[in-house]
């Protein structure tokens, strides 16, 4: 197994000697057959080896200085034996295999995913991977879930289109979300750094096979549909229910097997990976919440209260797409709409919040365009996300028109637009619900409004486009309940569980 070599890696974390006995006790409980329905496996690092352990077997592996992996021990079945990227691709295939058992699941790039996580000094002692079926609504989860490196939860859509992109349609290939930043930089023609990379810590690769170097866009406009199941999105495009995203696919390429998110496959860790090209274990935004051993404090980054300041936890020296653009064109203008990972951007929604100058926020979503009132009335999250996304479109349209809130702006060389509705709807209703489909239609309409504004500005033909999600979304099984924390507490194991997956022993 190999992995793309990464930038300079931190010392990282592995189980300390004083916690070995506690780790063994925790593993004995987590891998017991009674928890097998809700626990796929546990990932850890000890004795300078990475390990994946399940109830029926384990594998240990090491990484060399070139980023290559070697398996050094296997007992029973290797839980990470299937790292294919094409499994359950296509909506019909996914629906025919809902809630796959771990022995039937795939875990793309699993060795690299495990290693990058434990490259962080803030990594947990044990990372528990939920089963695909596990429904943990009793612990704050949802019908639709993500976080695992199981393929449906890890698989996000990726569309690259417009000027400078080959017209290939849907291709039977996979990418990684960390490929996004270097690909956008290459598409724009950003000058690489002396080491040949586009950002300081680059774990991804520029997807040059789908780019047309004979053409160079003047602008890249990127959209993120948070938490979108790629099979659902591509199917709706094919059936004419998402015509604007379908238009982008017709103008370029969609990765039919998706773009794999980084472990943990959660929001802010992967927003940051997309924009910086680095894995969470390298850029520092390790999860939506984690424990900082150095301060003895919990860190929460993915909340309304902490979004504006979440990038304070970035590893020093991390760069973004915005930085790559400015290094090549110092006078270029870039904009980040509704995106917490806004480092290097000239315009940022969350910079308004940091300055106490909050943009206009509608009181409610009723009567707003591209809003399905059937769901905004009964669903608080659908309502809130519709308001947030409408506010984002208002900012994007103002920037493209040249003026927002009476301030003039040039056309951005790079414009990033984050939409939240799909995540809210696919969590609440599940990815295969009518609520989920409505969220895709609403978000597609908002993309259409931005495309229309670009046409009115006269720059459409000079634009390239990228559309991704930060992770996938998998429907859990409401009958598959359970809580490993109860079992750990009953056995007297002293462990702090952050984000319901990261176990810190003795904390």
Task: Describe the role of every protein-language-model region.
Residues 44-49, 190-218:
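Polar, surface-exposed loop/tail segments
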């Amino acid at each position: 197994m190999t992995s793309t070599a990464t930038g300079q890696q931190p010392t990282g974390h592995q189980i300390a000697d004083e916690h070995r006995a506690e780790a063994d006790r925790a593993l004995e409980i987590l891998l017991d057959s009674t928890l097998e329905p809700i626990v796929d496996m546990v990932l850890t690092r000890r004795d300078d080896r990475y390990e994946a352990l399940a109830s029926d077997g384990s594998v240990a592996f090491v990484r060399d200085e070139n980023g290559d992996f070697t398996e050094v021990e296997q007992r029973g079945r290797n839980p990470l034996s299937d790292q294919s990227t094409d499994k359950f691709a296509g909506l019909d295939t996914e629906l025919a295999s809902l809630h796959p058992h771990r022995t039937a699941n795939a875990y793309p790039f699993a060795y690299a995913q495990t290693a990058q996580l434990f490259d962080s000094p803030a990594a947990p002692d044990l990372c528990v991977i939920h089963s695909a079926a596990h429904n943990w609504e009793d612990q704050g989860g949802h019908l639709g879930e993500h976080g695992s490196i199981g393929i449906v939860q890890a698989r996000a859509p990726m569309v690259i289109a417009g000027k400078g992109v080959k017209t290939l349609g849907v291709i039977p290939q996979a990418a990684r979300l960390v490929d996004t930043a270097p690909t956008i930089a290459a598409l724009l023609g950003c000058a690489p750094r002396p080491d040949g990379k586009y950002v300081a810590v680059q774990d991804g690769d520029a997807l040059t096979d789908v780019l047309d170097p004979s053409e160079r866009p003047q602008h890249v406009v990127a959209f993120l549909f948070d938490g979108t199941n790629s099979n659902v999105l591509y199917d709706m495009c094919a059936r004419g229910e998402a015509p604007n995203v379908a238009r982008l696919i017709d103008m370029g390429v969609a990765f039919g097997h998706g773009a794999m998110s980084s472990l943990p496959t959660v929001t802010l860790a992967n927003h940051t990976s997309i924009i910086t090209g680095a894995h969470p274990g390298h850029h520092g935004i390790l999860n939506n919440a984690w424990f900082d051993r150095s301060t003895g404090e919990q860190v929460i980054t993915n909340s309304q209260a902490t979004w504006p300041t979440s990038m304070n936890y970035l590893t020093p020296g991390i760069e973004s797409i915005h930085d790559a653009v400015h290094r090549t064109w110092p006078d270029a203008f870039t904009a980040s709409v509704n995106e917490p990972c806004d480092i290097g951007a000239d315009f940022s929604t969350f910079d308004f919040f940091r300055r106490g100058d909050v943009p206009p926020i509608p009181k409610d979503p009723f009567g707003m365009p591209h809003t399905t009132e059937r769901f905004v009335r009964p669903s608080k999250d659908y309502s809130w996300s519709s308001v947030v996304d409408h506010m984002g479109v208002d900012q994007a349209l103002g920037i493209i028109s040249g003026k927002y809130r009476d301030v003039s702006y040039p056309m951005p060389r790079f414009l990033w637009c984050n939409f939240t509705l799909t995540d809210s709807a696919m969590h609440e209703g599940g990815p295969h619900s009518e609520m989920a489909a409505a969220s895709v239609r609403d978000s597609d309409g908002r993309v259409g409004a931005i495309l229309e504004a670009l046409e009115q500005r006269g720059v459409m033909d000079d634009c390239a486009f990228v559309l991704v999600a930060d992770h996938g979304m998998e429907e859990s099984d409401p009958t598959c309940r359970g809580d490993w924390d109860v079992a750990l507490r009953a056995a007297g194991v002293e462990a702090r569980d952050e984000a319901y997956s990261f176990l810190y022993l003795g904390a």
